[in-house]
UniProtKB/Swiss-Prot annotation:
Cofactor: Mg(2+)
Name of the protein in its database record: Ribonuclease 3
Entry keyword Magnesium: yes
Broadest EC class assigned to this enzyme: hydrolase
Binding site for Mg(2+): 40, 113, 116
Positions of the DRBM domain: 154-224
Assembly and interaction partners: Homodimer.
Gene giving rise to this polypeptide: rnc
């Protein structure tokens, strides 16, 4: 296991002074009481701060809302798991037998949590400067991506642009049902496109939210 940890350190481009921090950051709760749950809590805050600070400096003309959406996009679980897979993090996790048999080393939530825990371990071992350097290294391609601001567009706008680029008809949103009490209504919307077989659905506390969710579902279907 020592060789594996050394290999992971090379992938992270970081040498631990206290390897115990890394071992705990890699230990799932199914594998023992000295697990990564507390590290995950700390790592989540460290990551959020570093990304927020970087976005604040990179995009001086963005509003608070735009910066918040960019940060949410970059620190969401799916993004963390994607980065974790790039460094083969699942190969180094300490899992209980049940989690191991069920493929926990591939699970998005576990990979995301473990990556946050590792960031906390680096912070505890080497301080904030070290943690920031590693975070920016891991995120460099995403922060430099010219399409990063694409996530600022809402789902209906993204779907419309995709359809126009693909020479499809524009989507139609139909309110199919409203249920619940007046103060807690649920709106149901169907999204269809002429000439396209797929149908998407969205539900939300208002029509606008339901349409956005239906558009998001349709875009995911079309993009596969």
């Amino acid at each position: 296991m020592k060789i594996n940890l050394e290999r992971l350190c090379r992938r992270l481009n970081y040498h631990f002074n206290n390897i115990a921090y890394l071992k705990q950051a890699l230990t799932h709760c199914s594998a023992g009481s000295d697990n990564y749950e507390r590290f995950e809590f700390l790592g989540d805050s460290i990551l959020s701060f570093v990304i927020a600070n970087e976005l604040f400096n990179r995009f001086p003309l963005h509003s608070e809302g735009q910066l918040s959406r960019l940060r949410s996009f970059l620190v969401k679980g799916e993004m963390l798991a994607e980065i974790a897979r790039e460094i083969d993090l699942g190969d180094y996790l300490f899992l209980g037998q049940g989690e191991l048999r069920s493929g926990g080393f591939r699970r998005t939530s576990i990979l995301a949590d473990a990556l946050e825990a590792i960031l906390a371990a680096i912070y505890l071992d080497g301080g904030m400067i070290a943690a920031k350097q590693i975070i920016l290294m891991l995120y460099s391609s995403r922060l430099d991506d010219p399409d990063l601001n694409h996530c600022l567009k809402d789902a209906k706008t993204q779907l419309q642009e995709f359809l126009q680029a693909s020479k499809f008809a524009l989507p139609e949103y139909v309110l199919t049902k409203i249920e619940g009490d007046e103060h807690a209504q649920i709106f149901h919307v169907t999204c269809t496109i002429e000439g396209v077989s797929q149908v998407a659905y969205g539900t939300g506390p208002n029509r606008r939210k339901a349409e956005q969710l239906a558009a998001k579902a349709m875009l995911e279907q079309l993009q596969g």
